[in-house]
């Protein structure tokens, strides 16, 4: 159960608690940090609970905050400056604050699989298979009889619309649909009309630099002993971002040059009208994408992915599965080659042993004749 008590062992001292989502924050990460920080206060947490963020706001998120009257969360660079930390909308250390391993994480509220997180102490972790972290937070509010005001309802609704692409993404569950409809009523907005307004704001990219476009919603994922990077943007007109593919590829390549452990970079352009994708793909592991979707990546690095719309449900698991298969095949092949080399070496040693033995015999024979000759 979500605790009403402070996790502090020193209850006389007010603590600073940071609540934040992942790097390159999207609307759900930002809204969830505000919603979760408010939940802590409503639950009676007497500490200084601060909603935070690890990066800049995108246009979609700015629109949602302004529409419902919220200020952006506090921008932070170090999580360990806080006494305690609450993570929302992520748990993967690679997607969190750079010093997350030095911070004291006390709670996690998420809707992703557990990915690389560990804690030496028992903590509260709630991650559920729904389309949005704010869907999980809505349930926590209801379970604890906390009233959801109009503006907080609007913020939760914005996150659900964003993460589920207006309830059309493969990640959408019936719980997301029911929650979104309830929140729309509380917020006093028409779900479809507001949803289209919000998503349209997120597709405006003409004044966004290539670097910011690539990293406004980008996540790193470990796959075996390698890493992949997947960025995603929404678009009503895929031609606009595709016309900028050269600049986008340059940003991606420069990033890979600096981060040698990234073996594949995918920049996904989601057509939110048809729910198809165009992906710009670079890196030595491009074959994983081709195998996953039975496609061939063009010389320009662009590939069409029919009915592929979700990074969480499709892109990451599909690509990871096939990359792991490639890694295993390479390991088997390497092992086979090593065994071949071992056999070659064994045969070489056997041959050398035979030659050495023959040489010994010849030497003994020669010495015998020399002895007889001198007698």
Which sequence ranges carry the predicted segments?
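Asp/Glu-rich intrinsically disordered low-complexity tracts
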Residues: 337-353, 357-361
């Amino acid at each position: 159960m979500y605790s009403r008590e402070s996790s502090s062992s020193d209850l006389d001292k007010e603590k600073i608690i940071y609540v934040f989502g992942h790097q390159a924050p999207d609307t759900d990460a930002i809204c969830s940090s505000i919603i979760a920080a408010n939940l802590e206060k409503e639950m009676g947490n007497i500490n200084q609970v601060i909603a935070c963020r690890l990066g800049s706001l995108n246009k979609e998120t700015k629109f949602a905050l302004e529409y419902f009257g919220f200020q952006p969360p506090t921008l932070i660079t170090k999580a360990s400056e806080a006494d305690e930390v609450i993570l929302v909308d992520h748990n993967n250390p690679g997607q969190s604050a750079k010093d997350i391993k030095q911070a004291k994480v006390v709670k996690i509220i998420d809707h992703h699989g557990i990915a690389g997180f560990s804690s030496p102490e028992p903590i509260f972790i709630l991650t559920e298979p729904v389309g949005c972290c704010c869907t999980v937070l809505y349930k926590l509010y209801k379970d604890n009889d906390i009233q959801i005001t109009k503006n907080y309802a609007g913020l939760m609704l914005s996150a659900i619309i964003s993460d589920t692409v207006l309830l059309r993404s493969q990640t959408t569950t019936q719980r997301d649909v029911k929650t979104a409809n309830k929140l729309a009523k509380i917020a006093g907005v028409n779900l479809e009309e507001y949803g289209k307004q919000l998503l349209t704001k997120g597709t405006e990219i003409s004044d966004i630099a290539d670097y910011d476009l690539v990293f406004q919603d980008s996540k790193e994922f470990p796959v075996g002993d390698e890493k992949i990077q997947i960025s995603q943007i929404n678009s009503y007109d895929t031609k606009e971002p595709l016309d900028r593919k050269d600049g986008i590829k340059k940003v991606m390549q420069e990033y890979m040059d600096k981060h040698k452990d990234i073996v594949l970079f995918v920049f996904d352009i989601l057509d939110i009208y048809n729910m198809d994708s165009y992906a710009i793909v670079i890196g030595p592991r491009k074959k994983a994408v081709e195998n996953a979707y039975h496609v061939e990546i063009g010389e320009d690095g662009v590939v069409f992915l029919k009915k592929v719309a979700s990074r969480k449900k499709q892109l990451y698991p599909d690509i990871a599965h096939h990359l792991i298969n490639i890694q295993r095949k390479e390991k088997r092949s390497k092992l086979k080659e090593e065994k071949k080399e071992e056999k070659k070496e064994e045969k070489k040693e056997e041959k050398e042993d035979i030659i050495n033995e023959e040489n010994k015999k010849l030497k003994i024979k020669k010495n015998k004749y020399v002895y007889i000759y001198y007698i």
